[in-house]
Amino acid sequence: MADMQAGIGPFLGVFLQQRGWQTGPIGTVMTAGGIAGMAMTVPAGAFIDHTAHKRWVVVITGICTVLASFLLLWSQAFLVVAGSQVATAIAGAAIGPAVAGITLGVVRQRGFNAQNGRNQAWNHAGNLVGAGLSGWLGWRFGMPAIFFLAAAFGVLAITAVLSIPERAIDHRAARGLEPEHQATANGQAEGFRELLSNKPLLILAAALACFHLGNGAMLPLYGMAVVGMGKGDPAMFTATTVMVAQAVMIVASLAAMKLAHQRGYWLVLLVSFAALPLRGLLAGAFIEHWGVWPVQALDGIGAGLQSVAVPGLIACLLDGTGRVNVGQGAVMTVQGVGASLSPAIGGWLAQMLGYHATFFILGGFALASLALWIGFAGTLRPACAAGAGRP
């Protein structure tokens, strides 16, 4: 599913670069997709909360993602590429909350932290294998082979989702309403103002937005920087950037699961926010083939920890409200502001100032995340500890 959801993902930049695109327009089409996905995450989360057909949401959006990716083979015109990215992002906005909802519905709140940690470890393993195969196929047969691999993964993901028995999913538990909850009248979902009045949730969303403003563009730009300087094969080097990060993410996601259980989510997220400024510093200083190892290892630490801590913390903060998946979508929307702006900002900065300065600037954006997380520690630490240590 990891490979289906992203389409050709990080290979898009070098695919378009090989066809004469510059970094500015590449960043712009990525941002167009990010904005579309950002606009759809809250409606998608609300729909996931209400629907009893969560499996089919994953199936239909997965098919749309694969078809949208194939548009790029047909044409590399600006409007076609932008449309493909918009469609992929909209589909991806629904897949994330749907998988989280299915997980919560199967294992309930008590088992969510552990199961989500395992899910994310397997998710990163899938990305690792997919990147390795994509790199080899792109090197051996050309970049178009990557599109067909994404389609094959789509078939496998759909088969896996449909193998989950529908009766195994408790759709009330999937939205954060279990029998023992007394927080809401008549066991009904609380209003949307619950999200706006939840201060830890708002701080989390703002910190993630700052983080992704710096993080979103760094992977594709680093790949384009090294490949553009003739220091790496386009397909194989891009695959290496993904594989290094995903290998570290597997370990980081499992570590996050245990650390959250023992110490709460605040420390897990603090470490993840601290990784990005150091990553930007290293990326700006060393645009070399070997630089992929430290730069992408830090990406793996940050993203791997967040992949477990963010959905787990949101599920805890909104437990009993009936708005868990709306909350997931709302936080994804706010962080999506940063993630969607990052490629455009990074792309044009690279075109005007060069790659070195761009990486330093992107890494600097994450300092705002650290400031928020440490500055509001008194509010966040008790909230982040609640529920994380449940067996």
For each predicted feature, which ranges?
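Helix-loop boundary and gating motifs at the non-cytosolic
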Residues: M1-G34, L202-I203, A207, H212-V226
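Loop-to-transmembrane helix entry
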Residues: Q22-A32, G230-Q246, V326-G329
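Helix-to-loop junctions at the C-terminal end of transmembrane segments
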Residues: A39-H53, G138, A252-G264
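Structural signature of the two symmetry-related core transmembrane helices
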Residues: W56-F70, A151, L267-L281
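Cytoplasmic helix-loop-helix junction between adjacent transmembrane helices
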Residues: V86-A125
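Symmetry-related core transmembrane helices of the 12-TM Major Facilitator Superfamily/SLC fold
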Residues: A145-S163, F359-G375
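Juxtamembrane intracellular "pre-TM" segments in multi-pass secondary transporters
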Residues: A168-L204, R390-P391
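A late C-terminal transmembrane helix in Major Facilitator Superfamily
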Residues: R323-Q351
